[in-house]
């Protein structure tokens, strides 16, 4: 322990002496004195060039104003694009909903309107609703009564029995 303390004390004195010797040599040669200290003692010029600082501040302020203008243009453009994206997504979601609804009902995917079975069964209903009566309505017996299957009815499969 005593050896370590002696060793550290010797190192401390060596470092301290080097610094003190360096200061003494700088004072003698005059090379250790900074230029700011020379200006203070010698002439009446200020240490800081105020005109350069003011011109730098003005340039930075102009750059900030320019950046803010660009940011405002980008902000407007992004808000317009966001609005358009909202409209497009709304239209797409509505179209997907319409297609899903119509396919579930068994209609054409893009049909808009009522889903009356009478409209789907009678394609001539559109012409009658327009005020154009059919000149030759030909109704046959097959149109009125559906065909009955011929043969044994026991071969037909019914749901609750099987």
Swiss-Prot record:
Please list which residues make up the signal peptide.
Answer: 1-22
Query: Which residue spans traverse the membrane?
Result: 80-101
Cellular location(s):
Parasitophorous vacuole membrane
> Which residues does the annotated region (Disordered) include?
109-162
Give the start-end ranges of region Epitope (deduced): 120-137
Q: Which UniProt keywords apply?
A: Malaria, Membrane, Signal, Sporozoite, Transmembrane, Transmembrane helix
List, as start-end ranges, the regions of compositional bias called Polar residues.
137-162
GO CC, any one term: symbiont-containing vacuole membrane
Q: What Pfam families is this protein classified in?
A: CRA (PF06589)
Q: Where on the tree of life does the source sit, at the highest rank?
A: Eukaryota
Query: Where is the sequence biased in composition, kind Low complexity?
Result: 114-130
Cysteines engaged in disulfide bonds, as pairs = none
Extra remark beyond the main annotation: This protein is addressed to a new compartment within the cytoplasm of the infected red cell. It also surrounds the parasite, probably in the parasitophorous vacuole membrane. This antigen and the circumsporozoite protein appear to have a common epitope.
Q: Identify this protein by name.
A: Malaria protein EXP-1
Q: Which organism is it from?
A: Plasmodium falciparum
- Lineage, opening ranks: Eukaryota, Sar, Alveolata, Apicomplexa, Aconoidasida
Gene name of the encoded protein: EXP-1
